[in-house]
Amino acid sequence: MERAATHFLRLHKSGISALCSGVIDPDYGITSPVLFSGDIDGEVTIWNLITRRPIFTSKICNEQVVDIQFLEGKYLSLLCKDHKLRLYELLKLGAIVKQSDFGGGDKVDLKQIFEVPVNTLNFANYVLTYLGNNKFELVTCHTQDAHFIDIYEFETPELNSLKRFSKAIDFLPMLRDRFGDNLLPKMDGLGIIMKFYKVNEVVYCGFESGYVIAFRRYRNKPLYRKRVSGFIGKPINECASGISKLLQHENVETSSSVNDLELDNVIEIVLVDRAHYPDPVLDMAPNPKKNGIICSSTTNKLVLTSVDEQYLAGPNSAYIFKSDEYLLDKKNCLLMSTNLKIDGSAVKDMMCKNIGFVLSLGDYIITGNWSGKTYIGRIESDKAVLAAAKSRSLIEVNESPVGNIQQDKSIQKSSKHTKIGAMTGFEVKDKEPDKLMCKNKELTPGKLRRLNAFVQSKWYFIGYTDGTIGLYRAE
């Protein structure tokens, strides 16, 4: 049964292209959950989700906002189509807040603290992680080729602190060495990167080929290789990568227990999943049941995949790996267990094709397709129902003084629903509702009641191409 939105937020004059929700650090004086929205003209707005009023709006750039991330309750990062990733910090309490308890007078402002060029000539987003002490890690597409990955670190507010630790990471050579012709029988390569998503310490990459590859980075944790006689798996020719070539002429007596190589900033591949092969991965969301992800494609299927626990643990507690148990590329930066297999994950039918958006809230899965319809189901159920579809006006406005007696066929074929530009959700987990309420003890009973009613529900927010944002309850 289709569900009506509880409210619509209206301020943007162009289509919504990015959404993100969160809770601002209480030191900043904002006493409610917030929603960040960006549109195709570069306008960014921060909404108070209880009053449903904007507390900040500004034109960040003249291009589309591609993706928004909110970290640590005070850092806002924006990726825009002008090929720049901007990082902002909320200003201190005394400088930004006009205390009105809970009303529309609460205001925030943003201060830009970092900017870095990023390749946006593709579909992919990025992953930004706060490392502590004003340091950040950035995972994004390679500057010149969206088939590859770059990993950076930087420290704010030092603009010259940007350092690239991994350049143009290419998974394909190692995967071909390991899996041969079984990897991509119908395609020449993995294709461009379509989506990044990070769960705990693991970064998932969805590719144009439909493959999902997950990796973890050993940051500031040196790995040591223990050389073992023999070579890994089948013999690898001279054109291939991997440490097998290094081991073909080893002396058994002298190599059995020698830690001969120390590696820094190693990337370990921990999952290879066919997922949607050969259809492209369109979106990803966390899978709370398996500590993995849910990914969508142009078909009506969702794929639920996760990393096996044995690979989450790493080589061992001493960070020593045996040469006959792991493949190592020729640059000594990529590592993969020889026991790793191509996964075939659980598949879920969501009753609609072209699932451009997927979201998980507890055990709910919400999907949005290209035609503007939203479906909702549960992770462990085969049923999904139509949840939302915002009707658009069927009356086309023609500003020309000259009429047209012939009906435009393109109007007849266009969708009767407003298309979706972005989706996000909000839920307060476990004991967080009580924690959030404790932080707001000074609110009046009525305002506390409104806040409590909001945080007890699971919410999803849909940004439409007409500039409106719908607020929906998942229950």
From Swiss-Prot:
GO biological process terms, semicolon-separated: chromatin organization
UniProt keyword annotation of Lipid biosynthesis present: no
Keyword list, A-Z: Chromatin regulator, Nucleus, Repeat, WD repeat
Localization per record: Nucleus
Keyword Nucleus annotated: yes
A GO-annotated cellular component: nucleus
Spans of repeat WD: 11-57, 60-98, 443-475
Lineage top rank: taxon: Eukaryota
Family in the record: Belongs to the WD repeat ASA1 family.
Subunit structure: Component of the ASTRA chromatin remodeling machinery complex.
Function: Component of the ASTRA complex involved in chromatin remodeling.
Name of the protein described by the UniProt record: ASTRA-associated protein 1
